[in-house]
């Protein structure tokens, strides 16, 4: 993300939060990025973030920008069900994820209603074993090509 901002002439400062680091004051933060990882790492990160659940929720509800990919997205939901264990999520988004049969891997193209045509397409790559189901919020985009949150469900994010 830093490199893409630099390419566009946008200055940025990255503050990495590592395990056991306290969460900084979010009032001056422009964007939070939560990435992914393996199931064991997700469990550890979720336990750490649980301490800051209210701060993250308030940041988002105060129009803060948060990008969550892979397991980071799943952790924002109600729960993530593994084969033999259920990880309680942060309950910030009304979603839940369950382990599926096999991985969904390949290119994905989304149409995002919140972007203006002709620049409303998002192209990416998906590689996930979880199947995420959305409750009461609007998906990030409609799948034009690929799988999305679950097996050919028609939406992603």
Tell me the role of every PLM-derived stretch.
Residues 32-34, 64-68, 120:
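Short glycine- and Lys/Arg-enriched binding-loop motifs that mark or flank ligand-binding interfaces
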Residues 1-61:
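N-terminal beta1-alpha1 cap of cysteine-dependent amidohydrolase-like domains
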Residues 8-11, 22, 81-85, 113-121, ...:
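Short, glycine- and charge-enriched coil/turn segments that flank and shape catalytic ligand pockets
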Residues 15-17, 33, 67, 91, ...:
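Hydrophobic/aromatic beta-strand patches that form the interior of the parallel beta-sheet core
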Residues 39-114:
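Cysteine-nucleophile active-site neighborhood
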Residues 98-157:
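Amide-donor transfer/coupling interface in amidating biosynthetic enzymes
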Residues 33-35, 73-77, 125-132:
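Long, contiguous hydrophobic alpha-helical segments, chiefly transmembrane helices and signal peptides
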Residues 18-20, 94-96, 126-128:
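Residues at the C-termini of beta-strands that transition into short coil/loop
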């Amino acid at each position: 993300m830093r490199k893409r901002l630099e390419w566009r002439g946008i200055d940025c400062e990255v503050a990495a939060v590592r395990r056991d680091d306290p969460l900084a004051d979010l009032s001056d933060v422009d964007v939070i990025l939560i990435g992914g990882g393996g199931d064991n790492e997700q469990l550890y990160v979720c336990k750490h973030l649980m301490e800051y659940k209210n701060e993250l929720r308030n940041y988002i509800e105060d129009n803060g920008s948060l990008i969550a990919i892979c397991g980071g997205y799943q952790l924002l939901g109600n729960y993530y069900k593994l084969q033999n264990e259920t990880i309680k999520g942060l309950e910030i988004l009304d979603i839940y994820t369950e382990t599926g049969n096999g991985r969904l891997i390949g290119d994905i193209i989304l149409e995002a209603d919140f972007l203006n045509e002709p620049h409303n397409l998002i192209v990416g790559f998906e590689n996930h074993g979880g199947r995420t189901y959305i409750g009461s919020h609007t998906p990030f985009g409609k799948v034009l090509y690929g799988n999305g949150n679950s097996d050919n469900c028609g939406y992603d994010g």
